């Protein structure tokens, strides 16, 4: 599994040849990972859509599913992304896991569930249609500029939050579908 944590990689992607075109993160990822393994799978460009969250949890048991349905890391919170899976012919032994309890278990307030302006996270699901519809309105501009308000409300790893150009790029990509 290959991914990134926090916003630091954005300046690298933005300065790369892919940084000025459409889908810079996906194109940069494909270029950088090409040739590192016998094959590479990506979480974008499907179908087929591969079970990246399941693979990530197997590789790193400290990852847990947050109330928002995305993986939370005990140090980086919701501010990490899975970019690719490297496939090798030979079996590679993983280092011993460092399982830790999910930080969500001890979070009584669950601000992530209360902060979404359209209540898109409820009943154990995510109302993607309501979220995207809201983003297309003037009221949705704070989310488009600052990033997902529910993710920003999570106290875990807040210092690693995506900000500025990266947050805006990711929100535009999500809003487009």
Where are these regions (language model features)?
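Non-ligating segments of multi-cofactor redox enzymes
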Residues: 1-177
